[in-house]
């Protein structure tokens, strides 16, 4: 069995890829460059995780048109990545408009071309409270798109094992799977030493605190 795993190099996607391997899949790692601030570090970490899993393939896809589209502090450097405490409610400014539809479209092409059985994406409970393209309803709808838009015998299943879990629960799974979290990166703002205050750093640090383990990456 083969699975395409969307692998950003972050905590969730790395745990996800390790879980897919544990589930018996050979890994086809798929990484995206879309002009995000921390792309250099993300790519480095994604490659390390792919090597850790003996991935069959590591495919990097350039989606820098999403940077040209703009409207996200991840890709528009004129916008500041806000501290978690300053972010407020509603859709965060780190939301990249309709990003997951773009990523999953490429993942579906890759999966169909390689004869993969599944696509793994690491959406989780704290994501869909703010990101509309992480909602379970969106994932269900995209499964229909995959089924209707691929060959009748493709049978590609979109898997979201973390969709009802919080970050601490995901981290517990990862610890059982011996995920090398020192080779992952979550910070939205920095490439060398994590800022510790952006939304992504906040939720990662909180997850480690909740299970009583020291996060192995450096913070300011």
Swiss-Prot record:
InterPro entries associated with the record: QueC, Rossmann-like_a/b/a_fold
Q: SUPFAM superfamilies per the record?
A: Adenine nucleotide alpha hydrolases-like
Quote the record's binding site residues for ATP.
7-17
Pathway membership: Purine metabolism; 7-cyano-7-deazaguanine biosynthesis
Q: Which domain of life is it from?
A: Archaea
Q: A Pfam family matched by this chain, by name? A: QueC
For this chain, one GO molecular function annotation is: ligase activity, forming carbon-nitrogen bonds
Q: Kindly list the cofactors needed.
A: Zn(2+)
**Which annotated residues bind Zn(2+)?**
187, 195, 198, 201
Q: How are cofactors bound according to the entry's free-text note?
A: Binds 1 zinc ion per subunit.
Q: Which UniProt keywords apply?
A: ATP-binding, Ligase, Metal-binding, Nucleotide-binding, Zinc
List its EC numbers: 6.3.4.20
UniProt catalytic activity: 7-carboxy-7-deazaguanine + NH4(+) + ATP = 7-cyano-7-deazaguanine + ADP + phosphate + H2O + H(+)
Membership in a protein family: Belongs to the QueC family.
Q: What does this protein do?
A: Catalyzes the ATP-dependent conversion of 7-carboxy-7-deazaguanine (CDG) to 7-cyano-7-deazaguanine (preQ(0)).
Q: From the Swiss-Prot or TrEMBL record, give the protein name.
A: 7-cyano-7-deazaguanine synthase
Q: What is the lineage of its organism?
A: Archaea, Methanobacteriati, Methanobacteriota, Stenosarchaea group, Methanomicrobia
